[in-house]
Amino acid sequence: MSLYATQDEKKQAAAKAALKHLPKGGILGVGTGSTVNFLIDLLPELQLEAAVASSQATADRLKKLGIEVVDMNHVGSLDAYVDGADEIDRHMHMIKGGGAALTREKIVASIAKKFVCIVDDSKWVDQLGRDFPLPVEVIPMARSAVARKLVSLGGDPVYREGVVTDNGNVILDVFNLNILNAIDLEKTINNIPGVVTNGIFALNPATIAIVATNDGIEERTAQ
């Protein structure tokens, strides 16, 4: 029997458990997505100096709670970055980008001293990419050319119709990739001309994962 009646209750529990890993009174990097939204609603407890948002949607939600949102260009580093994941494995490698904010998420995470990932256990996987397609942000004019390159890597790219990123680009969701070496594949895809970035977060993995399971909260680090 689960401690939680719904998946949303798991997400809320993970968000609450993450608070102790986040700085009080500092500047926090904040990700995007349904789990992060539960966390944002708790952030007033931390009395943050400010936040750097990874998307316009996150910025809007933070501002509604009275939390100042600052431009990343005015911040040298962040004490922590907190975000969810579409998938995460035992190496703390992740697939992100279901909400199409992967590029800004990756940029904000890159200046943080630690990356706190909050998920429910449905996102914990043995191998990335088996169940969730890999999002790739692409400059619009390069969509077809990039898609052909992704096919040559063994993937099955699908254009995410009707979605434009905050950066004005499009998303290709790549199915059936065999992600055995996440670091190498992240580099390979990012080197395709026209790719802005892809949703593998392996070069800059999570520091700790806060995982809500049926039995409660687990804190996991790389194995």
UniProtKB/Swiss-Prot annotation:
The keyword Zinc does not apply. Its EC number is 5.3.1.6. SUPFAM superfamilies: D-ribose-5-phosphate isomerase (RpiA), lid domain, NagB/RpiA/CoA transferase-like. It is an enzyme of class 5 (isomerase). Signal peptide: none annotated. GO terms for biological process: D-ribose metabolic process; pentose-phosphate shunt, non-oxidative branch. Pathway: Carbohydrate degradation; pentose phosphate pathway; D-ribose 5-phosphate from D-ribulose 5-phosphate (non-oxidative stage): step 1/1. It comes from the Bacteria. One of its GO terms (cellular component) is cytosol. Substrate binds at T32, G33, S34, T35, D83, G84, A85, D86, K96, G97, G98, G99, K123. The active site is at E105 (proton acceptor). InterPro entries: NagB/RpiA_transferase-like (IPR037171), Ribose5P_isomerase_typA_subgr (IPR020672), Ribose5P_isomerase_type_A (IPR004788). It catalyses: aldehydo-D-ribose 5-phosphate = D-ribulose 5-phosphate. GO terms for molecular function: ribose-5-phosphate isomerase activity. Keywords: Isomerase. HAMAP family: Rib_5P_isom_A. Belongs to the ribose 5-phosphate isomerase family. Homodimer. Catalyzes the reversible conversion of ribose-5-phosphate to ribulose 5-phosphate. This is Ribose-5-phosphate isomerase A.
